[in-house]
Design a protein with these regions (language model features):
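Nucleic-acid substrate recognition interfaces
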Residues: 2, 18, 37
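Single, function-defining residue in the core of a domain
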Residues: 1-8, 46-47, 58, 71, ...
Length: 347
């Protein structure tokens, strides 16, 4: 898949044949059988995958979002680890038939969250970050009371919010003068008056609409909440890397017959993202990122994943003076994979 740069079965097969010297026809069949192999239990794989990705972290922020594949009538619920390198790392996912969402969406979200809680190492603090599609007081209750997760979830601006002193307004009406942030501690939300830790309402000049965020925290500052919710966008960038035919690996443009096959394809995608991110981290540690950008800024221009993709394409003709240190650094990271503790700290 790394050789092909695509998630299409035939293209992965071509890449496998190229990398291993196989017959293209037989390589494509191997990939097809892999995706249909019932012996590959995604739930079992994710129980190992989640602790590996989390690594030595004691607290994590997890973005949750749906992405749809209209041509196949499927949708995937993705939970991704928010990182510092520009891309959210796939952590856990569940693909279902879109036709079942109307009556079962909450059940699917609950199922995925429970699977995450079961797979995580003990004593890991989790904060779920999600957009307006998840702004439901029932979900808030499940997260805090049952799963013991924190949350920062956006909700619609027309939802009623009651301040601690009893004053009630729509969420958008709580935005401060000039769009300034206003934090309401121990606020009540919705007509059911469900109590949350805090509500943040803000509309920066660059925002098309106000951000109305509900959080379980009673102490987080407005700046902290805004920065955390802003990182949620990295899951959208991850979807583009996976789905887009031009800028990514094209999953959104290929036909996948069943949700189970798509979940196995997501697993291959997660492995590819992990390896390419590690390659990008190895290159950046050696200062190779300055060869990949046209500007002279010292800050990171490309995500580690994008750096890994670019370096992988350059490897066949890379001079030995640059190639050998890169391979050695990458191999050193791979050597840590049995324990994963430090390796996945960067992923």
């Amino acid at each position: 898949m790394l050789s092909s740069g695509s998630l299409a079965v035939s293209t992965i097969g071509h890449g496998l044949a190229l990398a291993r010297g196989l017959t293209t026809k037989h390589a494509i069949k191997q990939v097809d059988r892999l995706l249909s192999n019932e012996g590959i239990d995604i739930d079992a794989a994710l129980r190992h995958w989640v602790p590996y990705v989390v690594g030595p972290r004691t607290s994590i922020n997890v973005a949750m979002d749906w992405t749809e594949f209209d041509a196949d009538g499927q949708a995937t619920l993705m939970l991704s680890l928010l990182t510092r390198h520009g891309r959210a790392t796939p952590l856990l996912w569940l693909t279902v038939d879109t036709a079942t969402l109307k009556n079962c969406r909450n059940e699917y979200e609950y199922q995925a969250l429970v699977r995450l809680a079961d797979a995580l190492p003990a004593d890991i603090k989790v904060c779920i970050v999600a957009d307006r599609g998840f702004g439901d007081h029932k979900l808030y209750h499940v997260l805090t009371e049952e799963l013991k997760f924190d949350y920062v979830i956006r909700f619609r601006g027309n939802i009623q919010v009651t301040a601690a002193d009893g004053e009630m307004r729509t969420a958008a009406a709580w935005v401060g003068r000039g769009g300034r942030a206003r934090v309401l501690r121990d606020a009540l939300v919705t007509a059911e008056r469900y109590q949350v830790g805090s509500v943040l309402c803000v509309q920066d000049k660059a925002m098309k609409q106000a951000w109305c965020l509900a959080t379980s925290s009673t102490q987080a500052s407005a700046k902290t909440l805004i920065c955390l919710y802003g990182k949620r966008w990295s899951i959208e960038c991850g979807f583009r890397d996976t789905k887009d035919l031009r800028f990514g690996m094209g999953m959104g443009s290929i036909h996948v017959s069943t949700p189970t096959r798509r979940d196995r394809l997501w697993l291959l995608n997660a492995f590819a993202i992990m390896l390419l991110t590690l390659l990008g981290a190895a290159g950046e540690a050696l200062g190779y990122d300055r060869y990949l950008k046209s500007n002279t800024t010292k800050r990171r221009t490309h995500s580690l994943f994008r750096q890994g993709c670019m370096l992988y394409d350059l490897i066949p003709n890379m001079p030995d003076g640059r190639l050998l240190p890169l391979i050695e650094r990458f191999a050193a990271m791979l050597a840590e994979l049995p324990v994963f503790a430090d390796t996945f700290g960067v992923v």
